[in-house]
């Protein structure tokens, strides 16, 4: 297993100080009810042009300093009861690290867990929002000359959509220091904290981190088309999305895996995160997601056409419900859905699968000036049965980061139906 050595650690200050009128950033109810974790993303660049080889860190630091002036809550401090951020311009934590192996050793490994070395130790998915900077960046240098750029952002301030906007704006600034981002930290105007609510009771309990294993699988565009054809020919489903058909397949493989272990079928619950932008404006920064809950109570409902039909129905029902809902009601409804899911998890009546998506965000093309990454990934998730969908590096396919227990992964990765439509992702960086 590769190890890392910290070369330097510093705080990146804002290029322009935050105006006193923006010093107190009110958190929204959506922010408040999220798990206070650091979400970890990493971008791998194996070949650095010679004109950048000696100034990568300088480019990242200078551009980060400027972009933080627009994303100022990331350089502040979250208060103890998660109601506001003191935008005191403390800065973002920035580490320079040396990795004692070539990048190919990481990217060609069958399991994704080895990428954890490019993240600050013990930070990914941890509840460190009060003790660490809301943004922690690590630049990792490999023996081969390649680099990885990782960013861990506090989920209290950002959801995945906002993280993608920030990374894209940071990269645009790195390429052109005249670029001006336009984020709006106004989520609390749409989702205000209700004054009558006992805030401490809405805070989610943090769960101890557990070690699982992750593998990334690729669904090529042609295989996604095959899956869509299967679904549409055997049902009344129209225009299934690539995430819907891929979700249905990994869900079915999960059910097969579970039945191999227990010898019987167990009902399932799958959750998908849905972005609320729109109707919320696209440049609204903060947490603005709701969850879609889909169940399969029988083996027949697990079949691809049937499960995709249920996914689409549940998605449309949620859209219809939210369409007529006042914005200040949305957080309470989201909290209600979350509590329903937690009750099912605690009762252990269903196998639960958690899905989130970072598709159509441009993260697979993040270019700080030295080209696009060959791999975008996350640190190993603490929750088992977790599926994260991302755009593949080229084309219209999907990459899916799958986290399971070690024993379950051994069964899952040998599933013939999975391997008919998806393949493990490994890269050659030579």
From Swiss-Prot:
Record-listed E.C. numbers: 2.3.1.-
GO BP annotations, alphabetical order: sucrose metabolic process
Annotated tissue distribution: Expressed in tip cells of type I trichomes of stems and petioles, sites of acylsugars production.
Keywords: Acyltransferase, Transferase
Residues forming the catalytic site: 155 (proton acceptor), 367 (proton acceptor)
Phenotype upon gene inactivation: Reduced total acylsugar levels, with abnormal accumulation of di-acylsucrose, S2:17 (5,12), and two triacylsucroses, S3:19 (2,5,12) and S3:22 (5,5,12) lacking furanose ring acylation, but impaired accumulation of S3:15 (5,5,5), S4:17 (2,5,5,5) and S4:24 (2,5,5,12) acylsucroses.
InterPro entries: CAT-like_dom_sf
Presence of the UniProt keyword Nucleus in the record: no
UniProt superkingdom: Eukaryota
GO molecular function: acyltransferase activity
Catalytic EC class: transferase
Functional note: Catalyzes the transfer of short (four to five carbons) branched acyl chains to the furanose ring of di-acylsucrose acceptors to produce tri-acylsucroses such as S3:15 (5,5,5), S4:17 (2,5,5,5) and S4:24 (2,5,5,12) acylsucroses.
PANTHER family: ACYLSUGAR ACYLTRANSFERASE 3, F21J9.9
Sequence similarity: Belongs to the plant acyltransferase family.
Subunit structure: Monomer.
Stated name of the protein: Acylsugar acyltransferase 3
Native source species: Solanum lycopersicum (Tomato)
């Amino acid at each position: 297993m590769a190890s890392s050595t910290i070369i330097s650690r510093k705080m990146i200050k804002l290029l322009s100080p935050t105006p006193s009128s923006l010093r107190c950033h009110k958190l929204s109810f959506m922010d408040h009810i999220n798990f206070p974790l650091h979400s970890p993303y990493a971008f791998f660049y194996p070949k650095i042009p010679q004109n950048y080889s000696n100034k990568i860190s300088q480019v990242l630091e200078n551009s980060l300093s400027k972009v933080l002036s627009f994303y100022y809550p990331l350089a502040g401090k979250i208060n103890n009861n998660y109601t506001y951020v003191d935008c005191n311009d403390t800065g973002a934590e920035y580490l320079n690290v040396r990795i004692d192996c070539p990048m190919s050793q990481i990217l060609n490994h069958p399991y994704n867990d080895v990428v954890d070395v490019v993240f600050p130790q013990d930070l990914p998915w941890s509840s460190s929002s009060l003790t660490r900077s809301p943004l922690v960046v690590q630049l990792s240098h490999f023996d081969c000359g390649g680099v990885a750029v990782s960013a861990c952002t506090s989920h209290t301030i950002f959801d995945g959509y906002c993280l993608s906007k920030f990374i894209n704006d940071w990269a645009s600034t790195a390429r052109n220091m005249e670029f001006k981002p336009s984020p709006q930290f106004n989520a609390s105007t749409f989702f205000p904290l209700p004054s009558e609510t006992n805030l401490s009771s809405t805070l989610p309990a943090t769960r101890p981190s557990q070690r699982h294993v992750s593998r990334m699988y690729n669904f090529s565009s042609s295989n996604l088309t095959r899956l869509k054809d299967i679904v549409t020919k055997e049902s009344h489903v129209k225009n299934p999305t690539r995430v819907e058909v891929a979700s249905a397949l990994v869900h079915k493989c999960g059910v097969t895996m579970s039945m191999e272990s227990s010898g019987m079928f167990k009902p399932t619950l799958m959750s998908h995160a849905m972005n609320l932008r729109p109707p919320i404006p696209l440049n609204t920064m903060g947490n603005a997601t709701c969850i879609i809950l889909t169940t399969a109570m029988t083996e027949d409902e697990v079949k691809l056409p049937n499960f995709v039909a249920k996914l689409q129905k549940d998605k449309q029902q949620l859209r219809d419900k939210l369409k007529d809902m006042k914005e200040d009601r949305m957080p309470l409804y989201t909290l209600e859905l979350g509590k329903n899911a937690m009750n099912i998890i605690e009762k252990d009546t269903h196998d639960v699968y958690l899905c989130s998506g970072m598709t159509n965000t441009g993260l697979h093309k993040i270019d700080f000036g030295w080209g696009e990454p060959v791999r975008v990934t996350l640190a190993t998730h603490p929750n088992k049965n977790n599926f994260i969908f991302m755009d593949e590096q080229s084309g219209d396919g999907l990459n899916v980061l799958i986290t399971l227990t070690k024993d379950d992964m051994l069964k899952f990765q040998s599933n013939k139906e999975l391997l008919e439509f998806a393949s493990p992702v490994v890269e050659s960086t030579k």
